[in-house]
Each structure stands twice: as structure tokens, then as C-alpha cells.
């Protein structure tokens, strides 16, 4: 039976929801259509709960718009349908690849002239709230190089996708104009090339090399700190490129003005274009990243496993993908199915280390310092808003970042009942949805505790 209702809904949702969210939550749903209802079957409890919480209302609206006289009833269940089975992905092979075969697959395909990694594209970049602006700005640079945002400055912690985005811009530029001169390099390479040019009395050739490009993509500019001659040369190169409307993209591990040992004139010029932060990915994006990576590798990763890994690994994408590689490798070597229990065992030492690093005591100290109150205030019976709100934040963070039960968390906060902790978690969730300042506070605390 053709699911015309669901197909129409899906077409609308495809216009409204980013691809990674569609692939993670919507496309796994299987539809069963009857006269007065549309039943959507989710592959597991995680997908079911997420769809109910985030998409059910919108799907109901779309159904009502299609049949305003007799709106079909939406039903969400766990199950599967042989009629609308999703395409299967390859299962994890239990055969250990030979070292030579593995070596052939490991190096990324690169362009010798540009140093670009052709695997880093916009298609393989998973978009989320944490990197949405950075991706949009990068796309604009591709559309209008040298004029839209010049320079484009991306900053954020290690392993958050800054380099991926920079390569994606370069690759997209070359697809549009294969003759374009796009050069990617690490700032350390710029310094090394300059030193070599000085040693061989070839500084003019060095200048021509870096100033005759259409786009210069330079990674980790914090490496220039306290290197006065390198900063001097880059300053003039930077000016020459901007005067010629040649695109400059830079990355850094922190906001440019926070880089000690970097000349003020450079910091000032870096702010001429657009400066964008990339934050650690939120839970939904982390799940999408894992599912996307598994799909690229041809691995059938259950949603509940992706959800488990994403809940426990929060710091950056590099560690997230590293955890996935470890789980997949263990499955290959042992021939076992990837389940949540198998994943817990495969990541046992990693999770144990994380549990040691993030404790309720650490959370209480961090929250107290953030709100400029005492830890004793968090544990007290005081109920003023200046104390209650930080206490609720700390309880919610303890629930998210540790494996302690609600009663254990309540006990650590002055012997409170588990229902108090549950209320605090729900309160923080609703406040974050309503107040962007509280959401920012929570994100800041989460980032501090996770890195």
C-alpha cells in the first residue's frame, strides 16, 4: 500500500529539518496507513521517545492540513514493517583486514597542489546548533569568495570540526573553479617555509608563493604567538591578500583577542571579517555524527548504541569518533554483535576514567564558582532564587554527567529527596527552552565540566 499521507508529510519535513536530523530520527520510521490513522513504527525506544518529544506535534499538524475535514490520528509505536523496510547497511565484518589493505585505506585522498583532504566536504560535515553559524558562513564564502566574509575566523576547542569546515570550503571552491589556486596549511608550515626562505635568501619567492593564491586557509594561528618575525611576515601577507580580495580563512583554539603573544595589529585585522565560534556538539548532533560516521564506514550501528556513546562522550568529535572506532574494532576482532552491553565493555576503561574526572563534588565546586556562591549554599536549605537556581543547575548537571541515581544525587545535595532532583532536572530543561541566558549558562557549565 502506498503511504501517500506519510510521503507528503515527509516531503514537507525534508524542507524544514536538517538532513542529519532526518536521517537520525525521521527516515528510520516505517509507516502503516489506514483510513483514519497513520501509524509510525520506530526501530527502538530511543527513536520513539525523541520523535514524540520533538516531531509528533508537527507531524500531526501536517496530517490535519492534508485532510482538514477528517484529520487522521497519529500513532507512534515500536515495531517494524516488512512492507516498508529501510535499506540495510553492511554488517560489521568479523574478518581482520590485512595490514597492507588497512594501510591502503587509511591515508586520506589529498590534492598535492592545495593540501586539501577531499574527504572533508560539506556533505560529510554534520550540522547542529553548535556549528550552524560556522557552516552557514563557510557556505557564503564559497558563494562569494573574497567579499562575503573576509577574513573568516573560526575558533573553538580541539576536535570540533574547524579544520573539516576549512577543507570543505577549499574543496567546494575547487569544484566550482578547478583552476582556482587554493592553499591549505598549518601555521607551523608557514613558519617553517619562512625560516627556510630566509636561510636560502629566497624571501621574495616565499612572498610570491603565499600571495598569488585565490584562497589561503591557515590552521591554528595561535602557533604564531611570540614568533615576531613570523607575525611580521604574515601581517604583510594578510594585508596583500585582503587588498586583492583573495579569501583568507583562519582557525584558532580560542577567541583571537585571548591569544597571548599575538600582536594587537593582527588581532585587530582578524576581526575585520567574521569571527565565529564552534561549540562542543549537543546530544542530538553527537548522535547524528555517530550515525553518519557509521554509515560512511558501512557499519550497522543500532540507534541505542549511538545514543549511549553520545551521552557518555561529550567533549569533542574526535573523541566521539575514536570511541566508535574502538567499538567497531572490538566487534570485528571478536565477531560479536554491537549492543549497548558490548559497547560498555569495549569502552570500559574510557568510561571509568571519565567517571573519575566528573564527580558530583567537581560539579558542585564548578557551579558554585560560576555563580559566585559557596558550595555550602548549594547544600543548605536556603530557597532564595540566587541559591535555588544554581542548585537546580548542579543537580541537572549531575544527572547528565554522572552515572549516579537520583537518590544518590539528592543525598549529595544535603540529603534531599529524589523527587527534588527530578523536579530540578525538569525545571532546568524548561528554563533552557524559554530563556537563552539560562541555556547559555548551562552550556558553559557543561563545556567546562566536559573538557
Swiss-Prot record:
Region annotation (Domain I, interacts with DnaA modulators) ranges: 1-82
Taxonomic superkingdom: Bacteria
Any one Pfam family match given in the protein's UniProt record, by short name: Bac_DnaA
Name the record gives this protein: Chromosomal replication initiator protein DnaA
Binding-site residues for ATP, renumbered to this chain: 159, 161-163
Domain II: annotated span: 82-114
Region of interest called Domain IV, binds dsDNA, as start-end residue ranges on this chain: 332-451
A Gene Ontology molecular function term of the record: ATP binding
Coiled-coil regions, chain positions: none
Location of the region described as Disordered in the Swiss-Prot/TrEMBL record: 85-112
Family matches, as SUPFAM superfamilies: P-loop containing nucleoside triphosphate hydrolases (SSF52540), TrpR-like (SSF48295)
Predominant localisation class: cytoplasm
GO biological process per UniProt: DNA replication initiation; regulation of DNA replication
Gene3D superfamilies: 1.10.1750.10, 1.10.8.60, 3.30.300.180, P-loop containing nucleotide triphosphate hydrolases (3.40.50.300)
Assembly, per entry: Oligomerizes as a right-handed, spiral filament on DNA at oriC.
CDD domains xref list: AAA (cd00009), Bac_DnaA_C (cd06571)
Notes concerning its domains: Domain I is involved in oligomerization and binding regulators, domain II is flexibile and of varying length in different bacteria, domain III forms the AAA+ region, while domain IV binds dsDNA.
InterPro entries cross-referenced by the UniProt entry: AAA+_ATPase (IPR003593), Chromosome_initiator_DnaA (IPR001957), Chromosome_initiator_DnaA-like (IPR020591), Chromosome_initiator_DnaA_CS (IPR018312), DnaA_C (IPR013159), DnaA_dom (IPR013317), DnaA_N_dom (IPR024633), DnaA_N_sf (IPR038454)
Role, per record: Plays an essential role in the initiation and regulation of chromosomal replication. ATP-DnaA binds to the origin of replication (oriC) to initiate formation of the DNA replication initiation complex once per cell cycle. Binds the DnaA box (a 9 base pair repeat at the origin) and separates the double-stranded (ds)DNA. Forms a right-handed helical filament on oriC DNA; dsDNA binds to the exterior of the filament while single-stranded (ss)DNA is stabiized in the filament's interior.
Keyword annotations of the record: ATP-binding, Cytoplasm, DNA replication, DNA-binding, Lipid-binding, Nucleotide-binding
Gene: dnaA
SMART domains in UniProt: AAA, Bac_DnaA_C
Region (Domain III, AAA+ region): 115-331
UniProt family annotation: Belongs to the DnaA family.
GO CC terms: cytoplasm; plasma membrane
Subcellular compartments: Cytoplasm
Signal peptide: none
Amino acid at each position: 500500500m502506498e503511504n501517500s499521507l506519510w510521503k507528503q508529510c515527509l516531503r514537507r519535513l525534508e524542507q524544514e529539518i536538517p538532513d542529519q536530523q532526518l536521517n537520525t530520527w525521521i527516515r528510520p520510521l516505517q509507516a502503516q496507513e489506514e483510513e483514519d490513522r497513520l501509524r509510525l513504527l520506530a526501530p527502538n525506544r530511543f527513536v520513539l521517545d525523541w520523535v514524540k518529544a520533538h516531531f509528533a506535534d508537527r507531524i500531526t499538524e501536517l496530517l490535519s492540513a492534508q485532510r482538514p475535514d477528517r484529520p487522521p490520528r497519529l500513532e507512534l509505536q515500536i515495531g517494524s514493517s516488512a512492507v516498508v523496510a529501510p535499506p540495510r547497511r553492511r554488517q560489521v565484518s568479523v574478518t581482520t583486514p590485512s595490514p597492507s589493505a588497512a594501510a591502503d585505506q587509511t591515508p586520506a585522498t589529498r590534492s598535492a597542489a592545495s593540501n586539501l583532504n577531499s574527504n572533508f566536504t560539506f556533505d560529510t560535515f554534520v550540522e547542529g546548533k553548535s556549528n550552524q553559524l560556522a557552516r552557514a558562513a563557510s557556505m557564503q564564502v564559497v558563494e562569494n569568495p573574497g567579499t562575503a566574509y573576509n577574513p573568516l575566523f573560526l575558533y573553538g576547542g580541539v576536535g570540533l570540526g574547524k579544520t573539516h569546515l576549512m577543507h570543505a570550503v577549499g574543496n567546494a571552491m575547487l569544484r566550482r573553479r578547478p583552476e582556482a589556486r587554493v592553499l591549505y596549511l598549518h601555521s607551523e608550515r608557514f613558519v617553517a617555509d619562512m625560516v627556510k626562505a630566509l636561510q636560502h635568501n629566497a624571501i621574495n619567492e616565499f612572498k610570491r608563493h603565499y600571495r598569488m593564491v585565490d584562497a589561503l586557509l591557515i590552521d591554528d594561528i595561535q602557533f604564531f604567538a611570540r614568533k615576531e618575525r613570523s607575525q611580521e611576515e604574515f601581517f604583510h601577507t594578510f594585508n596583500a591578500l585582503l587588498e586583492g580580495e583573495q579569501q583568507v580563512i583562519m582557525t584558532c583554539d580560542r577567541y583571537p583577542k585571548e591569544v597571548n603573544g599575538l600582536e594587537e595589529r593582527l588581532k585587530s585585522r582578524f576581526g575585520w571579517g567574521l569571527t565565529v565560534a564552534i561549540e562542543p556538539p549537543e546530544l542530538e548532533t553527537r548522535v547524528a555524527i555517530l550515525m553518519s560516521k557509521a554509515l560512511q564506514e558501512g557499519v550497522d550501528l543500532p540507534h541505542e548504541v549511538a545514543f549511549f556513546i553520545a551521552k557518555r562522550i561529550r567533549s569533542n568529535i574526535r573523541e566521539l569518533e575514536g570511541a566508535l572506532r574502538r567499538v567497531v574494532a572490538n566487534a570485528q576482532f571478536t565477531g560479536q554483535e554491537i549492543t549497548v552491553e558490548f559497547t560498555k565493555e569495549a569502552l570500559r576503561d574510557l568510561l571509568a576514567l571519565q567517571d573519575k574526572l566528573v564527580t558530583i563534588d567537581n560539579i558542585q565546586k564548578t557551579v558554585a564558582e560560576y555563580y559566585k556562591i559557596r558550595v555550602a549554599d548549594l547544600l543548605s536549605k536556603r530557597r532564595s532564587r540566587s541559591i535555588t537556581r544554581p542548585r537546580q543547575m548542579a543537580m541537572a548537571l549531575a544527572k547528565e554527567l554522572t552515572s549516579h541515581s537520583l537518590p544518590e544525587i539528592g543525598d549529595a545535595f544535603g540529603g534531599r529527596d529524589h523527587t527534588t532532583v527530578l523536579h530540578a532536572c525538569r525545571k532546568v530543561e524548561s528554563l533552557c527552552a524559554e530563556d537563552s541566558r539560562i541555556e547559555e549558562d548551562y552550556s558553559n557549565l557543561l563545556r567546562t565540566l566536559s573538557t
